[in-house]
């Protein structure tokens, strides 16, 4: 195997969207083209009992939303494609943000009836901050939606990125006839046996359709006043190619995939803490853990650390350094994924995502290196929780399961754990309410540990240096606690309590996370 050629084939990207824009459906269709599934399951399968291939966790199947980031791999057109399907629900932004650190491009799925929604905007900001290319798929043309020109204008105004339509819809909803493919200079037909037709046949096929005249006018306008196509601007994250289609009816998806693979970037390097970038073609293996997931196989109570390979080649059984602990580890039980199925992998290269079987060795953000290399990659973003709950085991006899469950789910980063300095009580922190629901559901379903949870409301969280801490600083307006790394932290009841503390202890420096 020529490693350099293998690395060149890799295309690793995440799919981002607002909930219900059709993200999981398009993932299914891409897997279908990659030959990984025989038929694309549909997310709304609550009545039929069929569930999306990429939504494997029990609570996701019940609710029809993605709450964990799945990783799936397939080969297509000479490329090895790694898709990371991110949680669409806003409460899981933490997991999504970390996932976006592990990819080289993003595909943004937009509901053409709704346009740019709040969650899409949030996720786009992260992608923009990273400077990676964004490809846009305007979905659900099988339903009535907004005017395509309006959608492009909104995209540019709200997200502040230039756009270039690769195709243009001919009608929509019941009147949807197909796509005018600007990039390939052909028509893609929605109805009938033929898939494509030449542009010259347009008047013959759609002459009586008022939509077709509008399409020709729109395209003339785009040619005169639209943005110029620039591969350089796409790779710099300054121009997003826009594709129209319908994931549900699998229309326009294959054309999108083929053009996407042509322009999506090869694996990029990753920054170390000293600012130097590790090149993917460096011969020495390196990677970082961007996610930990417990119980991917509930029968075995297992934990998988997801690793993005940054440079070199992974070989089964290799020894790696874990600079955070100063210790080493052996990578013998390693898998690659297709949602709920996995297979052991003997080697993988820069750009690939591998799953390392974990018995508690790894933490999110860990760097893996080989030989004399002991550097660390720049830290992944961490988030300050906004709402809190006290948590305890309902059954005193189940303390062992309770502690194991909390330890594993907290290491995943699904919720954050704090311990009251004075009472030793456990408190959970989260960005949104759904995280608590998922935590409770998984504690009961996966660890057989029922929990009692009582709301504490919103808190303003600040960390304090251990050397500055005096336990007398604790008052009725704050709770002194330790985080899971035993670092002291104050949970203030509101901003007023925080300001009061800052006035009283002007020399004490309080730290806020993202």
From Swiss-Prot:
It is found in: Cytoplasm. Keywords: Cytoplasm, GTP-binding, Nucleotide-binding, Protein biosynthesis. GTP binds at residues 17-24, 85-89, 139-142. SUPFAM superfamilies: EF-G C-terminal domain-like, P-loop containing nucleoside triphosphate hydrolases, Translation proteins. GO terms for cellular component: cytosol. Its main location: cytoplasm. Disulfide bonds: none annotated. GO terms for biological process: regulation of translational termination. InterPro entries: EF-G-like_DII, EFG_III/V, G_TR_CS, P-loop_NTPase, PrfC, RF3_C, RF3_dom_3_sf, RF3_GTP-bd. Residues 8-268 form the tr-type G domain. GO terms for molecular function: GTP binding; GTPase activity; translation release factor activity, codon nonspecific; translation release factor activity, codon specific. PROSITE patterns: G_TR_1, G_TR_2. HAMAP family: Rel_fac_3. PANTHER family: PEPTIDE CHAIN RELEASE FACTOR RF3. NCBIfam families: prfC, PRK00741.1, small_GTP. Increases the formation of ribosomal termination complexes and stimulates activities of RF-1 and RF-2. It binds guanine nucleotides and has strong preference for UGA stop codons. It may interact directly with the ribosome. The stimulation of RF-1 and RF-2 is significantly reduced by GTP and GDP, but not by GMP. This is Peptide chain release factor 3. It comes from Streptococcus pneumoniae (strain CGSP14). The gene is prfC.
């Amino acid at each position: 195997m020529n490693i350099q050629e293998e690395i060149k084939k890799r295309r690793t990207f995440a799919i981002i969207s607002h909930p219900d824009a059709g993200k999981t459906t398009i993932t299914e269709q891409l897997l279908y083209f990659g030959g990984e599934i025989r038929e694309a399951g549909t997310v709304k399968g609550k009545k039929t009992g069929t569930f999306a291939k990429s939504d494997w966790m029990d609570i996701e199947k019940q609710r029809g939303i993605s709450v964990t980031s799945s990783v799936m791999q397939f080969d297509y057109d000479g490329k090895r494609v790694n898709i990371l399907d991110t949680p669409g629900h806003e409460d899981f932004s933490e997991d999504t943000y970390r996932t976006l650190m592990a990819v080289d491009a993003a595909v943004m799925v937009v509901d053409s009836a709704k346009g740019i929604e709040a969650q899409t905007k949030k996720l786009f900001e992260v992608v923009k901050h990273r400077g990676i290319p964004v490809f846009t798929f305007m979905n659900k043309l099988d339903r009535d939606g907004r005017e395509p020109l309006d959608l492009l204008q909104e995209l540019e105004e709200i997200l502040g990125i230039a756009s270039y339509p690769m195709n243009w819809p001919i009608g929509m909803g019941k009147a949807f006839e197909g796509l005018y493919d600007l990039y390939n200079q052909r028509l893609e037909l929605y109805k009938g046996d033929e898939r494509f037709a030449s542009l010259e046949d347009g008047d013959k096929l759609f002459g009586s359709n008022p939509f077709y005249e509008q399409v020709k006018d729109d395209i003339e306008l785009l040619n005169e006043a639209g943005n110029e196509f620039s591969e350089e601007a796409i790779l710099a994250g300054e121009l997003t190619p826009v594709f129209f289609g319908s994931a549900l009816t699998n229309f326009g998806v294959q054309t999108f995939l083929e053009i996407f693979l042509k322009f999506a970037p090869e694996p990029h390097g990753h920054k170390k803490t000293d600012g130097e970038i590790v090149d993917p073609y460096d011969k020495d293996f390196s990677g970082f853990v961007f996610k930990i997931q417990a119980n991917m196989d509930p029968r075995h109570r297992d934990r998988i650390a997801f690793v993005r390979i940054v440079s070199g080649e992974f070989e089964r059984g290799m020894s790696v350094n874990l600079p955070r602990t100063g210790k080493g580890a052996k990578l013998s039980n390693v898998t690659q994924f297709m949602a709920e199925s996995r297979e052991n992998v003997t080697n993988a290269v820069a750009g690939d995502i591998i799953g390392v079987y974990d018995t508690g060795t790894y933490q999110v953000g860990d760097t893996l290196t080989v030989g004399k290399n002991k550097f660390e990659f720049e830290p992944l973003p961490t988030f300050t929780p906004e709402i809190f709950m006290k948590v305890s085991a309902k059954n005193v006899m189940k303390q062992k399961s309770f502690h194991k469950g909390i330890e594993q789910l907290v290491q995943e980063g699904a919720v954050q754990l704090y311990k009251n300095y004075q009472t030793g009580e456990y408190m959970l922190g989260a960005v949104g309410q759904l995280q608590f629901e998922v935590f409770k559901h998984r504690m009961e379903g996966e660890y057989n540990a029922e929990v009692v949870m009582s709301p504490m409301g919103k808190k303003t969280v600040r960390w304090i240096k251990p050397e500055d801490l005096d336990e007398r600083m604790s008052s009725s307006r704050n709770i002194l606690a330790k985080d899971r790394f035993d670092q002291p932290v104050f949970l203030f009841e509101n901003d007023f309590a925080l300001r009061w503390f800052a006035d009283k202890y002007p020399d004490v420096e309080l730290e806020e996370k993202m």
